[in-house]
Amino acid sequence: MEKREKLYEGKAKIIYATDEPDKVIAYYKDSATAFDAIKKATIEGKGVLNNKIASFFFQLLNEKGIPTHFIKQISDREMLIYKVDIIPVEVVVRNIAAGSIVKRLGIPEKKEFDPPLVEFYLKNDELHDPIICEQHIYAMDLAKPEEVQKMKELALKVNDVLREFMREQGIILVDFKLEFGRKDGQIILADEISPDTCRFWDAKTGEKLDKDRFRFDLGDLIEGYTKILEKIQKKEGE
């Protein structure tokens, strides 16, 4: 597999072409951003941790029959993935109230949602990723109704798998953000699953082990992410 030119650079990753047109390489950067990149920093080692954590989660989901863009981890910072046409909609699944929903709706933090909530956000930095409904998605021709239903179905399946897996490691999956893409006419999971995109709380102590550590200066980010990686690697080694 030959790594070729840079195709795209985002806040957390760089995408490179390969000598196979349907495959690309995702390189995980050490950048940390919050609040629409108003707060940003370079944190050495963050990219390595996120690549390893995301690779583990994608492999787990692939094994559970959930289609993802992940092929394999190829280095500490890189994974080989399928090239997809990204749908510009972020799908958020919430098991427990935290973050923006608390501020937006006045819902008490830590309120449990049963069943989990599924929300859609327009993937647009200039507009600050506003929350949207299904009708907005159709009106803007972002996705077809059957695609939106598939995204919801897959998001809830991801929640079932990861919530139970993390519970077994003593970690609460509070909420998470997913992105999806089209490949050969099918909807598959894309982007990443990591402490950048999920909220993880220690079930015993309530300690936050995700990007909220950086957002709100709650503690060392690397320490929190390392705890997540150690938990899942310990399980993998059993």
UniProtKB/Swiss-Prot annotation:
It is an enzyme of class 6 (ligase). Pfam families: SAICAR_synt (PF01259). One of its GO terms (molecular function) is phosphoribosylaminoimidazolesuccinocarboxamide synthase activity. InterPro entries: SAICAR_synt/ADE2_N, SAICAR_synt_PurC, SAICAR_synth, SAICAR_synthetase, SAICAR_synthetase_CS. Pathway: Purine metabolism; IMP biosynthesis via de novo pathway; 5-amino-1-(5-phospho-D-ribosyl)imidazole-4-carboxamide from 5-amino-1-(5-phospho-D-ribosyl)imidazole-4-carboxylate: step 1/2. PANTHER family: MULTIFUNCTIONAL PROTEIN ADE2, SI:DKEY-6E2.2. NCBIfam families: purC. This is Phosphoribosylaminoimidazole-succinocarboxamide synthase. The gene is purC.
